[in-house]
Design a protein with these regions (language model features):
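A short local structural element in Rossmann-fold oxidoreductases
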Residues: 151, 372, 377
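Ferredoxin-like iron-sulfur electron-transfer modules
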Residues: 341-363, 375-384
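Short, solvent-exposed secondary-structure boundary motifs
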Residues: 91-92, 368, 382
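C-type cytochrome heme c attachment motif
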Residues: 363-370
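Active-site anion-handling motifs in enzyme catalytic cores
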Residues: 1-350
Length: 384
C-alpha cells in the first residue's frame, strides 16, 4: 500500500461552502439560512468531524501556487483528481488552475478520474493544456468526452475510470454510515437543482407505494407537499439515508452513485444540456456502462415505475469496471505501464455488427447512451 495525504489547498472562491456562521446577524441576509440556522450549523459541524475522523489532510493549508512551490513537500508522487478540477470555467478568471495539474512540483504526477466538464477546450488554451498534460506519467479521465479531449490534445488514448466513490464496496460505505433520522423504508429525494422532471415520479411513487417522502435538502423547493426535509445530515447521515431508503429519486450524480452502491431502485434526471449531449454526461457514461440507462428520466425508454433492477448483473459490470480502474491506479502508483485486461474472444465467436441505414438515424443518441456494452459512439458529420 501507499501512505496518502490530502494537500489542504484552499481555493478562495470556495470559502463560503462550509463557512462557519458567526451568528444569526451575519446570516440575516439569507432568510433561508437564518430560518434553518440550527440544522445548517449541525451539518457544517458534522462535515468537519467526518473530515477529521476519515481524511488524512496536510497539517498546513496552502492558498496559492506560489505557497506550494516554496513548500518543502514530502511526497514521492502527486495524484490529481477527481471531479471538474480541469474545468477552466469554474475559476474566476476562466483559466486552468495550475495547482490541479501539479505545476508546483517536479515530482511524478498521476491523474485519476479528473473531468473537464466542458465539451471543448476554449480557443487559445490548447497549448497550455498540452504542457500540463505532458507532465503526467499516467493519465485517466472520468468521462468519454474527456478521453476525446486528451486524445485531441496529446494524441494519447487514456482510460476512462470510475468515480472514486465507486472504488469502495457497498460494505465500506455501510460501515461509515450513521442513522439519518428518518427511520426505514421511504422514498428518498436528493436534488441539487430544481426537481421539475422528478416531481411526477415522486408523486406517483408516493401514491402507488404509500411510502413517506424524505427530502435530503439540496434545493429550497419542496419535492412533494408532504415531504419531510432533512437539513442537518453530514456525510455519515447522508450515507445512512441512502442505506435505509426503499426508493431514490435524484438529479445528482453522486445521488445516483449511492443508489447503485446500496442497490436501491432509483430514477435520475439530468440537466437539459446533458440530455442534448449525453457523451459529455458523467451520469450517462456511468449508467450506460452498468446497463442502467433506462433509469434516466426523459430518454424515451425510461423504465416503468416499479420495474425491477437486475442487481446481480449490475454488480458484475460494476465489479469489472472497478477492477479495471484499480488496476490502472496500481500501475500508476507503481510507475508501470497500464495495459487494460480484456476477456479474449475467438474470431469465429464474434458476431459481425448489423449496421442500420444511416438515413434512418435521427441523431437522438439514444442507442449510444443506452448501449449496455458501451459499444456505440456517435460523431457529427456534415449532415448533423
Amino acid at each position: 500500500g501507499s501512505e496518502c495525504e490530502i494537500i489542504d489547498y484552499y481555493v478562495n472562491q470556495d470559502n463560503t461552502l462550509f463557512q462557519r456562521p458567526t451568528g444569526l446577524g451575519s446570516a440575516a441576509h439569507d432568510a433561508h439560512t437564518a430560518l434553518h440556522y440550527g440544522p445548517l450549523k449541525a451539518r457544517y459541524e458534522r462535515f468537519e468531524a467526518f473530515s477529521r475522523e476519515n481524511l488524512n489532510i496536510s497539517g498546513r493549508r496552502y492558498q496559492s501556487l506560489e505557497e506550494l512551490r516554496q513548500a518543502e513537500l514530502p511526497y514521492d508522487v502527486l495524484l490529481s483528481g477527481s471531479d471538474q478540477i480541469w474545468n477552466p470555467k469554474i475559476f474566476p478568471d476562466g483559466r486552468f488552475d495550475p495547482v490541479f495539474f501539479g505545476a508546483f512540483s517536479h515530482k511524478r504526477k498521476i491523474a485519476y478520474a479528473p473531468s473537464f466538464g466542458i465539451p471543448r477546450i476554449p480557443d487559445g488554451m490548447e497549448e497550455e493544456l498540452r504542457t500540463y498534460l505532458e507532465s503526467f506519467s499516467h493519465l485517466s479521465v472520468r468521462e468519454r468526452q474527456g478521453q476525446g479531449i486528451v486524445r485531441d490534445i496529446t494524441g494519447k488514448d487514456v482510460p476512462v475510470v470510475l468515480d472514486p466513490t465507486l472504488l469502495l464496496e457497498r460494505t465500506d460505505w455501510a460501515a461509515a454510515a450513521r442513522d439519518g433520522g428518518a427511520g426505514r423504508g421511504y422514498i428518498l429525494c436528493y436534488c441539487i437543482s430544481r426537481p421539475d422532471a422528478l416531481a411526477p415520479y415522486i408523486r406517483r411513487l408516493a401514491e402507488e407505494t404509500g411510502l413517506p417522502v424524505v427530502q435530503l435538502c439540496g434545493v429550497r423547493q419542496k419535492v412533494h407537499p408532504k415531504a419531510r426535509c432533512i437539513l442537518s445530515a453530514g456525510p455519515a447521515e447522508f450515507l445512512g439515508l441512502f442505506r435505509d431508503a426503499a426508493y431514490v429519486c435524484t438529479n445528482s450524480f453522486h445521488g445516483t452513485v449511492f443508489s447503485v452502491q446500496f442497490q436501491k431502485p432509483f430514477f435520475t434526471a439530468v440537466a437539459p444540456a446533458e440530455m442534448a449531449a449525453p457523451e459529455s454526461s458523467r451520469t450517462f457514461s456511468l449508467l450506460s456502462r452498468l446497463g442502467l440507462g433506462e433509469r434516466i428520466i426523459g430518454k424515451g425508454d425510461t423504465a416503468d415505475l416499479t420495474a425491477p433492477i437486475d442487481w446481480a448483473a449490475v454488480g458484475e459490470r460494476l465489479g469489472r469496471e472497478r477492477k479495471l480502474s484499480l488496476d490502472y491506479l496500481r500501475c500508476a502508483l507503481e510507475d508501470r505501464p497500464h495495459t487494460p485486461e480484456e476477456a479474449p474472444v475467438k474470431a469465429e465467436e464474434r458476431p459481425l455488427p448489423h449496421l442500420a441505414d444511416h438515413t434512418h438515424c435521427t441523431g437522438c443518441t439514444a442507442c449510444a447512451s443506452g448501449c449496455p456494452k458501451d459499444a456505440i459512439t456517435m460523431e457529427r458529420d456534415r449532415e448533423g
